[in-house]
Amino acid sequence: MAAANPWDPASAPNGAGLVLGHFIASGMVNQEMLNMSKKTVSCFVNFTRLQQITNIQAEIYQKNLEIELLKLEKDTADVVHPFFLAQKCHTLQSMNNHLEAVLKEKRSLRQRLLKPMCQENLPIEAVYHRYMVHLLELAVTFIERLETHLETIRNIPHLAANLKKMNQALAKMDILVTETEELAENILKWRKQQNEVSSCIPKILAEESYLYKHDIIMPPLPFTSKVHVQTINAK
């Protein structure tokens, strides 16, 4: 550290200078560290960096726009390419020529359209006869099934209502099936009872004839095999 000038009042040693001199003498701080601490950063450096960042962002935005324009030009290159434009022009010219020919033959075409086609026979090559036979079979089948298909198409709007009616009919059918099963069970039970009664009738008749012969009075109990007998002598 340079010695202070005793005649310069600004160079007179102060407390901070003495402390720094002590640190330098002890080796805790060197001159390079002091020189680095003396460097000051301008307050306009951040503004300069901000301006640079803004310029870079603007340049990036401009490049992105150029890239989008290039992509759009690439996508539309096939449309505006002279080769494809020439093909389209040729196609349009052909259609125009065809329409001109149709307009020129308008009268003959109208006469041909008014004339019934049943009076003309279209020639078909022999190699296509079998295909025509198959085609006619398909046409006949289609005509036969046309009415069914049309009826199906007409019923499409009423499909929900028809399904609802079908579900109701199925529910009623289930109820009828259940009632029929119960009725069949009752009929079987009744038949079984009738068979039992039929088998008991001869026994009852035999008992009545026996009681009648021996003057025995039987109380009127319907269809029972147990007879409570009361004789005249027991009274």
Swiss-Prot record:
Coiled-coil regions listed in the entry: 51-115
GO cellular component entries: centrosome; cytosol; HAUS complex; mitotic spindle microtubule
Compartments where located: Cytoplasm, Cytoskeleton, Microtubule organizing center, Centrosome; Cytoplasm, Cytoskeleton, Spindle
GO process annotations (BP): cell division; centrosome cycle; microtubule nucleation; regulation of microtubule nucleation; spindle assembly
Keywords: Cell cycle, Cell division, Coiled coil, Cytoplasm, Cytoskeleton, Microtubule, Mitosis
InterPro entries recorded: HAUS2, HAUS2_metazoa
Pfam families found in the cross-reference section: HAUS2
Subunit relationships: Component of the HAUS augmin-like complex. The complex interacts with the gamma-tubulin ring complex and this interaction is required for spindle assembly. Interacts with EML3 (phosphorylated at 'Thr-881').
Homology family: Belongs to the HAUS2 family.
Function: Contributes to mitotic spindle assembly, maintenance of centrosome integrity and completion of cytokinesis as part of the HAUS augmin-like complex.
Annotated protein name in UniProt: HAUS augmin-like complex subunit 2
Lineage of source species: Eukaryota, Metazoa, Chordata, Craniata, Vertebrata
Gene name of the encoded protein: HAUS2
